[in-house]
Amino acid sequence: DPHTAAFHPDGRLYFTTQGAGMLGRLHPETGELTEIQTESRPYGMQVAANGTIWVAYNGTNKLGALDPETMEVRYYEVPNGASRIRRLGLTSDGMVWYGNSTQGRIGRLNPQTGEIKEWPSPSGPESRPYALAVVDDVIWYNESGMRPDALVRFDPETEQFQSWAIPSGAGIIRNM
């Protein structure tokens, strides 16, 4: 059940398998496939500029930094054991941004210090941030708990939010 995939600059494909609780690596040229057991429900994935592969875990309150060579994962716990993360994004300063869907918050992990800071999403604890993208170091995400969904922009420099209702009625935005 591969869920999210990302190509690494070295040409290998890394992926999450949410139901199986595994991370995988495929070398397209040789067909070599490596899979490892990991924390519960690995979901979103992003490759950082330094080559680290960041993983969001939807079954725990953790983020993971996967070493592409050793396939070892360093875990970072986010506040509140009930937190769940589906998607994440990376800014040019190396920060890891995530939507905390069960707590209605967005957060930032500093991988150098392990420090985590969270901000409440504009629509509150039931807003359920889901998809997340970083554009020009500004965080964009949706609040999937709202009807209709809301699109939210967060500027890390000013710590200001803007949001817009998405009137399509088409359901939940799951990826950006």
Can you say where each PLM-predicted feature lies in the sequence?
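Beta-rich, blade/repeat-based domains predominating
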Residues: 1-10, 39-50, 81-93, 124-136, ...
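Short intrinsically disordered, low-complexity coil segments enriched in acidic
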Residues: 1-13, 25, 29, 54, ...
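Conserved beta-strand positions in repeat-built beta-propeller and related beta-rich domains
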Residues: 13-19, 53-60, 96-102, 140-146
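A short loop-to-beta-strand structural motif that recurs across blades of beta-propeller domains
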Residues: 22-25, 61-65, 104-108, 149-152
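Short loop/turn segments that connect beta-strands within beta-propeller blades
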Residues: 27-31, 67-71, 110-114, 155-159
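A short beta-strand motif characteristic of beta-propeller blades
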Residues: 32-37, 72-78, 115-121, 160-166
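Tandem repeat domain/solenoid detector
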Residues: 50-52, 61, 69-72, 92-93, ...
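C-terminal closing repeat unit and adjoining cap/tail of repeat-based domains
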Residues: 153-154, 158-165, 175-176
